[in-house]
C-alpha cells in the first residue's frame, strides 16, 4: 500500500522528460504584448493568457487578443486560451487637494466621509470614501485598510449617515484613489459595476474563453455574471475569485454554480489575517478537487522575479506547495505583465510544477477522491474514474479522450492520473478552456466527420496517438486507456478500452 512518507523518500528531484500537467497562466502587459514574446512564453510553458481589466483601454486589450492569436499562427503548438479578469466592484478613496500626498503620524484622528464635496478635496483632516453604505455596515472598533493595508485605521465613532471618525494605527500618507478594505465587515456592493458589464460584453464579442470574476461574495453574483454574458457567452467559463471573508463564508454555495475558482491571495490576505491564508488555500483547493472543478492559485507566486532573474526559495516552495495542494493552474501577474524576466519566470514556474508533480502520491490521492465523492456518480464520471484506475493497474502511459464539450476530460482530470490526458475534439473553444483542467493536453481535430461512426472514432483515436507521439508522451509498445462514446453527440462517453500503441 502506498504511503505518503514512503513515496517522498523515493522522490526524484530531476525534471526528466515527463510532461508538466499543471497549467500556467500569465498576465500580459507592455513587456510581453507582442507575438514574438508570446511565442517565447508559450514555448516556456504558458497555457492561458490573462488580461487585467483593472488597467488598459479596449484598444489595448484588443491588441493582446490579436497578438495572442497571431502567436498561434507563428507557433501552432497547443491551443492558447484567453482569460478576461474583471476589475470588479471596489471601494476607493477620493482625490487629494492639488493631487499632493499628506503625511500622517500614528494615532492621528480624522474624518472619513461619503459626502461628494470631499471627492476631490481629501487631505489629512478628511478623506472621501466612494462606498455610500459604509456608515450603515461598519461598526465602532472595526478596522479599515487603505492602499492594500499600507495604512490602517480604527473606527472611533459612526458620527452620522455620512461620517466616520477614525484613528490611524500607523504612520503613512493620504494619497489619491487608493483601494479600501473592510475586513470583518459584510459589504453590499453589486456583483458587477457598469464598467464590468461593458467589459464582459467586449470579451464575449471578441471570443474570450473564460472570465476571472473579481470580489465574488455570493452564488447570486455568479448568476448575475452568467446573465450578463448572455446566450452569445454561454460557453464562456466563469472562474470566481475568492478574495474576501464573505466569499470564504459562502464558498459551498458559490462552488455549486461556478465553473471554477481562483484563490486570489492578495486581497484575501488583507481581508482575513495573513496567517490564515495558507489554510484557507488548502481548504478551498480540496473542496474544488472533490467537486471536480478547476482551481487556480494566484498572487505573488514569483513576485521577486519582476525585478530579479532568480526567485526566492520561499517563492519556489509556494509554487510547489500549490501543486501539492491540488491546484490545476498557477498564475503569474506582474512577473509577466511588467517584469524584466517574464520568460524566466514562466520557465521557473514550469520546472517547479513538474518536480512538484512527482511528489504527489497519485494512488492515495485517487483513493481519497473516490472514497469522498458522493455516490452514485454519473455514467461519465464512473467511466472517468475507471480510466484512471486502469492507468494504475495497467501501467498505461496516457489516457486519450474523445470529447465534444470538454466535460469528460474535466472528470478524468478530477481523479488526478499520473499520465497525460490527451483530449481530441472538434470544438476549438473546448480545447482552449480545457487548459483549466490539470493534466489535459487538448488537440483540435479538423478533419470532416466520417459517415460511419466507428471509422470516425478510430480516425480521431489515431490522431490523438499521433499527437501524443509528436509531443513525447507515447512510443510504440506503450499501453493507453481510451474513452469515447457509443454514438455521435454530447453525453455519450461510456466506452473504455485498454490498447497497445
Curated annotation (Swiss-Prot):
Alphabetical list of CDD domains matching this protein: Pyruvate_Kinase (cd00288)
Site feature (Transition state stabilizer) residues: 241
GO MF term set: ATP binding; kinase activity; magnesium ion binding; potassium ion binding; pyruvate kinase activity
This protein's name: Pyruvate kinase
Organism: Lachancea kluyveri (strain ATCC 58438 / CBS 3082 / BCRC 21498 / NBRC 1685 / JCM 7257 / NCYC 543 / NRRL Y-12651)
Cofactor annotation: Mg(2+); K(+)
Gene that this polypeptide is encoded by: PYK1
Database matches in PANTHER family: PYRUVATE KINASE
Binding site for ATP: 52-55, 92, 178
Catalytic activity: pyruvate + ATP = phosphoenolpyruvate + ADP + H(+)
Documented EC number(s): 2.7.1.40
Alphabetical list of SUPFAM superfamilies matching this protein: Phosphoenolpyruvate/pyruvate domain (SSF51621), PK beta-barrel domain-like (SSF50800), PK C-terminal domain-like (SSF52935)
Top EC category: transferase
Keywords: ATP-binding, Glycolysis, Kinase, Magnesium, Metal-binding, Nucleotide-binding, Potassium, Pyruvate, Transferase
Family, per entry: Belongs to the pyruvate kinase family.
Binding residues annotated for K(+), in chain numbering: 52, 54, 85-86
Keyword Ribonucleoprotein on entry: no
Assembly and interaction partners: Homotetramer.
Pfam families reported in the protein's UniProt record: PK, PK_C
Amino acid at each position: 500500500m502506498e504511503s505518503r512518507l514512503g513515496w517522498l523518500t523515493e522522490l526524484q528531484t530531476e525534471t526528466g522528460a515527463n510532461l508538466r500537467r499543471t497549467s500556467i497562466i500569465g498576465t500580459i502587459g507592455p513587456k510581453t504584448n507582442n507575438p514574438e514574446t508570446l511565442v517565447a512564453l508559450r514555448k516556456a510553458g504558458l497555457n492561458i493568457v490573462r488580461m487585467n481589466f483593472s488597467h488598459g483601454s479596449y484598444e489595448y486589450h484588443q491588441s493582446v487578443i490579436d497578438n495572442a492569436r497571431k502567436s498561434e499562427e507563428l507557433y501552432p503548438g497547443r491551443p492558447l486560451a484567453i482569460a478576461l479578469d474583471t476589475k470588479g466592484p471596489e471601494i476607493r478613496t477620493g482625490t487629494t487637494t492639488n493631487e499632493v500626498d499628506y503625511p500622517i503620524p500614528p494615532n492621528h484622528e480624522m474624518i472619513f466621509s461619503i459626502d461628494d464635496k470631499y471627492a476631490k478635496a481629501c487631505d489629512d483632516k478628511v478623506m472621501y470614501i466612494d462606498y455610500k453604505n459604509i456608515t450603515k455596515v461598519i461598526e465602532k472598533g472595526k478596522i479599515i485598510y487603505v492602499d492594500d493595508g499600507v495604512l490602517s485605521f480604527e473606527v472611533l465613532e459612526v458620527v452620522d449617515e455620512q461620517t466616520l471618525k477614525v484613528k490611524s494605527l500607523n504612520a503613512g500618507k493620504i494619497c489619491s484613489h487608493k483601494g479600501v478594505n473592510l475586513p470583518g465587515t459584510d459589504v453590499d456592493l453589486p456583483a458587477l459595476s457598469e464598467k464590468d458589464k461593458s467589459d464582459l460584453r467586449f470579451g464575449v464579442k471578441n471570443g474570450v474563453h473564460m472570465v476571472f470574476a473579481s470580489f465574488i461574495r455570493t452564488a447570486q453574483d455568479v448568476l448575475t455574471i452568467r446573465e450578463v454574458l448572455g446566450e452569445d457567452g454561454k460557453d464562456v467559463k466563469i472562474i470566481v475569485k475568492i478574495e474576501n471573508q464573505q466569499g470564504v463564508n459562502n464558498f459551498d454555495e458559490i462552488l455549486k454554480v461556478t465553473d471554477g475558482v481562483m484563490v486570489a491571495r492578495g486581497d484575501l490576505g488583507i481581508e482575513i489575517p495573513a496567517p490564515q491564508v495558507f489554510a484557507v488555500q488548502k481548504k478551498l483547493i480540496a473542496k474544488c478537487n472533490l467537486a471536480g472543478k478547476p482551481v487556480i492559485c494566484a498572487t505573488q507566486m514569483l513576485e521577486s522575479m519582476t525585478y530579479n532573474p532568480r526567485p526566492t526559495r520561499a517563492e519556489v516552495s509556494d509554487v510547489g506547495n500549490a501543486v501539492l495542494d491540488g491546484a490545476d493552474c498557477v498564475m503569474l501577474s506582474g512577473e509577466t505583465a511588467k517584469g524584466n524576466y517574464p520568460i524566466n519566470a514562466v520557465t521557473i514556474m514550469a520546472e517547479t510544477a513538474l518536480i512538484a508533480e512527482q511528489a504527489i502520491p497519485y494512488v492515495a490521492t485517487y483513493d481519497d477522491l473516490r472514497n469522498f465523492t458522493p455516490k452514485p456518480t454519473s455514467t461519465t464520471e464512473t467511466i472517468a474514474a475507471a480510466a484512471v484506475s486502469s492507468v494504475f493497474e495497467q501501467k498505461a502511459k496516457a489516457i486519450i479522450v474523445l470529447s465534444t464539450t470538454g466535460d469528460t476530460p474535466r472528470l478524468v482530470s478530477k481523479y488526478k492520473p499520473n499520465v497525460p490526458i490527451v483530449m481530441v475534439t472538434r470544438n476549438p473553444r473546448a480545447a482552449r478552456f480545457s487548459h483549466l483542467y490539470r493534466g489535459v493536453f487538448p488537440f483540435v481535430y479538423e478533419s470532416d466527420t466520417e459517415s460511419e461512426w466507428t471509422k470516425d472514432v478510430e480516425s480521431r483515436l489515431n490522431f490523438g496517438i499521433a499527437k501524443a507521439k509528436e509531443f513525447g508522451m507515447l512510443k510504440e509498445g506503450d499501453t493507453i486507456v481510451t474513452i469515447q462514446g457509443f454514438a455521435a453527440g454530447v453525453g455519450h462517453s461510456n466506452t473504455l478500452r485498454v490498447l497497445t500503441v
